[in-house]
C-alpha cells in the first residue's frame, strides 16, 4: 500500500470540495501562498493514497460477501511461461484488464479445439488456450492479497490454492460422463459454455482491485476536478518500462530457483505433488479398470476421493488460523512489537500435510490388489489429497511472506516448476505402473515424497537463520 496522505487527505471528496469552493483567491488560482502560519504545501501533500484498510475506496473495505464472490470467480477460472509475461502487465494496467483479455482469448482458443480435424490443430490450439488461461495462476493470488488484510489472508488463500487442484479432479468426473454418452467434442463445447460464463462474470462482477492503479485513477479524477496537476499517485512516478518489467519477470524466478534453497526445495516439493496428481489420470484408469472392471464414467468418479480429501484439508483452515494467531501473539510478547510476524509461521499447514501425502500414497499403493475393495485405495487417495492442499496453502503464503519484495517472482517460480512437472509426469505414468507393477510404482512415488517431506519442518524451525544469509528473502 502506498504511504498515507499527509495532513487532512486531499484525496477525500470533502476536502476536494473545500479546495474548489475556497474564497481565498490564492488558493483558487492554485498558488502555494497561504495566509497566517499555514506552511507552504510540498509535493507529498499531493500524493494520493489510501488512509488505511477502512478507507471506502480501498478494496479491503469491501463487504465480506463481495470479497468472497471475487475470490470464487477468479479462483474458479484458472502454464509455465505465461504467468511470467502476463503477470507484470497487471502492474501497469491493473488486474481486471489482464483477466478480461486473457479469458477472452481462452474462450476463443477453445473453439479450434472443439472443431479440430487433426492432432496438430488440437496441440497448437491447446498451447494458446493454456497460455491465455495461465494468467490466473499468478495474477489471481494478487487479487486475494488486494482484498484481505494480512491477518485474514489464510482462509481465502486456502480457497485460491485449492482451485487449480479441484478442477483437475472434477474434470475426469464430468469429462468421462460426457465421453461415455456423447461425442468427445462435447467436452470442449461444454467447456466453451462454462468459460464464456466465467468471462461474463469477470467482466461484470469483478472490479479492479490493484491498489496502485486505483490510486492512479483517483489522482486523475482529482486533477480533472480541481484543475491542479500536482496531484499524483506513486505508480505515476515509476521509471521502469513494460519491457524492462517483463524481462525482469522472466529471469528473476530462475534466479530464485538457483540461488534460494528454500524457494528451490519447496517448489520442488510442490512440483512433485502436482506431477503425481496428474500422473493419477493414467494410473487410476489402469488400476480401477484392470482390478475392478470400472467403465469410463466410473473411473472418473474414482477421482472424487481426492476431491473429498482436499475439501477436508480446506476445512482444517480454522485450526491453522488459530495456530498462526497463537504464534503471532507469542512473537509479539517476545519482541514487544505489535503486528510483528515471521514468514515461518505460515508453514505449519505444510508441516502437517507432508506426512499425509506419504501415508496416502503408501495406502493407495499397497491396496491396489483385485482382492481389496475399490473404496480402500480411493480412501488412500483422499488422504493424499488432504495433504496436498495443506502443503500448498502453507508454501504459497510462506513464499509471499519470505520474499516480500519478490513475491510475484517466487510464485512465478513455483508456477513454472509445477507446470513442467505436471506436463511431464503423465508421459511416463502408465508405463511406470505397467512395468513396475501397481504396488511398487505407488511405493516409489511415496518414497520420493518422503525424501521431500522434512523440508517444510526444517524451514519452519531454521528458516529465520537461513533468511539471514539470503540476498532476496527478508532477513529476521
Swiss-Prot record:
Keywords: Cell membrane, Membrane, Transmembrane, Transmembrane helix, Transport
Localization terms from the record: Cell membrane
Keyword Repeat set for record: no
Membrane topology qualifier: Multi-pass membrane protein
Transmembrane portions of the chain: 69-89, 96-116, 127-147, 186-206, 264-284, 294-314, 347-367, 372-392, 403-425, 440-460
Positions of region (Disordered): 1-38
One cellular component term from this protein's GO annotations in UniProt: plasma membrane
SUPFAM superfamilies (UniProt xref): MFS general substrate transporter
Molecular functions per Gene Ontology: transmembrane transporter activity
UniProt note: phenotype after gene disruption: Greatly diminishes the production of terreic acid.
Ranges in a coiled coil: none
GO process terms (BP): export across plasma membrane; xenobiotic transport
Pfam families membership: MFS_1 (PF07690)
Gene3D superfamilies, alphabetized: MFS general substrate transporter like domains
Keyword presence, Iron-sulfur: no
Function per UniProt: Efflux pump that might be required for efficient secretion of terreic acid.
Family in the record: Belongs to the major facilitator superfamily.
Protein's recorded name: Efflux pump atB
Originating organism: Aspergillus terreus (strain NIH 2624 / FGSC A1156)
Lineage: Eukaryota, Fungi, Dikarya, Ascomycota, Pezizomycotina
